[in-house]
């Protein structure tokens, strides 16, 4: 190949690269040019929906008008599949969670891949699982509880919407402590809390926001936090490790993702906007009121987190033989 031809090829590549960079820059400057849709695979009014609306409001003021599209059903898979199939243009986002991106794929599988089907944008917040017992259980500490459970194998029960996060938390706790407790299926956790207070249900594994009213009223007792550190909502409740147990960590978490193939420039911009919002005292306070801790990080860190969580939840689902109800 002659030197002249090599120069022409290099010049052509340089022009192509320059044109590509110009197009990317122009696209970034024009985004968004229309409304952004945030799919929330939960019903309106619950804690996940409330957090999603906090984030949507922040994006509306910092990036562009963002509207909520609630698509609940099938353990979050209906809305999640819709997001995975959307155009990767930055105008359809998903409010992802430990249910949609870790638990549901492990239970059902095949509909979407939590790692390959999405472009992670930002981790938003998390809350640890708490083991709380009702008046039917005499134990005051987790050590007393484990001793009591081992003395009464198969006699204690815990509320477990089949295939739901509280069910997985209970199965993880069983495996970590070697106790024999029995899951009781509930379609609505409201009934489970009623039964716990009445002494008809022995224990519940759930996030602080749902348990706190009962704990503060003295109707339930929190024994342990299933996380690496204590929660600000219950500062006197020890972690698993502090209780001399395996350092088990399981949280309910949520974050923002987009369909796989979404331009990196959009992902980067949205990540910066989310992280800026999570530094806001108002958003921190709003999340704290929901028993949730704000988290920040890069898209790459969130991608690694999703992969790790998907494996953790899948391992528990497989070992416990759980199936989607």
Where are these regions (language model features)?
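An extracytoplasmic/periplasmic, membrane-proximal ligand-sensing/linker region
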Residues: 33-35, 176-177, 216, 242, ...
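N-terminal (or domain-start) structured segment
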Residues: 28-116, 154-156, 162-166, 178-203, ...
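Hinge/capping helix and adjacent helix->loop/strand transition within the periplasmic-binding protein
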Residues: 82-91, 98, 105-191, 240, ...
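N-terminal secretory signal peptides that target proteins for export/translocation
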Residues: 1-8
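Short beta-strand->loop
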Residues: 113-124, 159, 180-184, 202-203, ...
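Bacterial N-terminal signal peptides
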Residues: 12-25
């Amino acid at each position: 190949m002659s030197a002249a031809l090599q120069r022409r090829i290099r010049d052509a590549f340089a022009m192509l690269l320059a044109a590509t960079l110009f197009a990317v820059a122009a696209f970034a400057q024009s985004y968004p040019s229309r409304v952004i849709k945030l799919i929330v695979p939960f019903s309106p009014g619950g804690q996940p929906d409330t957090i999603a609306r906090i984030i949507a409001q922040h994006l509306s003021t910092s990036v562009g008008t963002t509207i909520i599209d609630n698509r609940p059903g099938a353990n979050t898979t209906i809305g999640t599949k819709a997001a995975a199939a959307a155009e990767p243009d930055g105008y359809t986002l998903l409010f992802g969670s430990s249910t949609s991106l870790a638990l549901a794929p492990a239970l059902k599988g095949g509909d979407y891949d939590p790692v390959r089907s999405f472009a992670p944008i930002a981790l938003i917040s998390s809350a640890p699982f708490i083991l709380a017992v009702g008046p039917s259980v005499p134990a005051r500490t987790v050590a007393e509880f484990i001793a009591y459970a081992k003395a009464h194998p198969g006699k204690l029960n815990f509320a477990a919407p089949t295939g739901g996060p509280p069910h997985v938390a209970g199965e993880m706790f069983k495996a970590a402590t070697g106790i024999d407790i029995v899951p009781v299926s509930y379609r609505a956790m409201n009934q489970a809390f009623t039964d716990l207070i009445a002494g008809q249900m022995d224990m519940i594994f759930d996030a602080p926001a749902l348990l706190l009213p009962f704990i503060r009223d003295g109707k339930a007792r929190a024994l342990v936090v299933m996380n690496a550190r204590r929660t600000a909502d219950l500062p006197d409740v020890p972690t698993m490790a502090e209780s001399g147990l395996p350092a088990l960590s399981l949280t309910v978490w949520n974050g923002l993702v987009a369909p796989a193939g979404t331009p990196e420039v959009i992902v980067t911009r949205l990540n910066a906007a989310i992280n800026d919002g999570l530094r806001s005292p108002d958003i921190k306070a709003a999340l704290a009121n929901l028993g949730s801790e704000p988290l920040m990080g890069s898209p790459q860190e969130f991608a690694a987190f999703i992969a790790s969580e998907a494996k953790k939840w899948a391992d528990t689902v497989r070992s416990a033989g759980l199936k989607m109800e």
